[in-house]
């Protein structure tokens, strides 16, 4: 898919990208680095504000614009126009974008219909599990993007849409199926690169209720809080391995 997108966008010279999350931002930055004219449409005010918070969202939105990406915030895509080929993208809150290529990275919703029909409890839009990936129905397990797994560290269920989590959870779920010791006790972590900037995050996700952003070494650290509890730490272009952040998150 990546090869096809790169080839089509490079040949066309212009591309619309729908979505202000990690997929949309990474695609927009990668295509712009290849010299493609890019329009990024998103319903949010700032890119990646959901997982990273307002401060880093503002910094990354400015970075994209500085590098030539046309960012259209609060733009809800309503239609793709064209017959045999794409001609334009229409959006509420933005002018029509004349492009021959579009990439949609607007997120997914887990398909839980079968689970619900089988009587499985759901939560956070996915299948509810305990710490050992057991669902509410005996001998049925769930892992990966669809699983809302109980985290004793967070004190709530987490549904993390990331390949590293899916890989780890699958191994633990298999151990649980075999009646071997298996307990979800991870602090989720992910990283991304946007142009030559590096992003890392460690924490439990969810809405950022409050944040403290600190300029550091030309980059930024953002500490996410819920009341007086640390729930996540995000960093942009800062040399920090986040080990201390992990320790604080584990300590609650």
Give names to the regions the model predicted.
Residues 1-34:
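Glycine-rich dinucleotide-binding loop and its adjacent helix/turn
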Residues 146-241:
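Mid-to-C-terminal Rossmann-like scaffold of FAD/NAD(P)H-dependent oxidoreductases
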């Amino acid at each position: 898919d990546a090869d096809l997108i790169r080839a089509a966008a490079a040949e066309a010279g212009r591309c619309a990208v729908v979505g202000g999350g990690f997929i949309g931002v990474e695609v927009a930055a990668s295509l712009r680095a290849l010299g493609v004219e890019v329009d990024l449409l998103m319903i949010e005010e700032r890119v990646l504000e959901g997982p990273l918070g307002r401060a880093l969202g503002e910094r990354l939105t400015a970075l994209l614009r500085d590098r030539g990406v046309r960012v259209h915030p609060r733009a809800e895509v309503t239609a793709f126009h064209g017959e045999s080929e794409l001609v334009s993208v229409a959006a509420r809150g933005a002018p029509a974008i004349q492009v021959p290529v579009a990439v949609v990275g607007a997120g997914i919703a887990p398909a839980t219909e079968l689970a619900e029909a089988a009587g499985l409890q759901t939560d956070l839009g996915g299948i509810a599990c305990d710490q050992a990936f057991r669902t509410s129905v005996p001998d049925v397990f769930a892992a990966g993007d669809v699983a809302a797994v109980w985290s004793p560290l967070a004190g709530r269920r987490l549904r993390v849409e990331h390949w590293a989590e899916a890989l780890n959870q699958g191994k633990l779920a298999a151990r649980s199926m075999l009646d071997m010791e298996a307990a979800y006790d991870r602090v989720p972590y992910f990283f991304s690169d946007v142009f030559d900037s590096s992003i890392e995050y460690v924490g439990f996700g969810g809405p950022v209720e409050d944040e403290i952003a600190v300029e550091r070494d030309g980059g930024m650290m953002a500490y996410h809080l819920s009341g007086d509890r640390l729930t996540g730490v995000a960093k942009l272009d800062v040399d920090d391995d986040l080990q201390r952040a992990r320790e604080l998150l584990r300590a609650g």
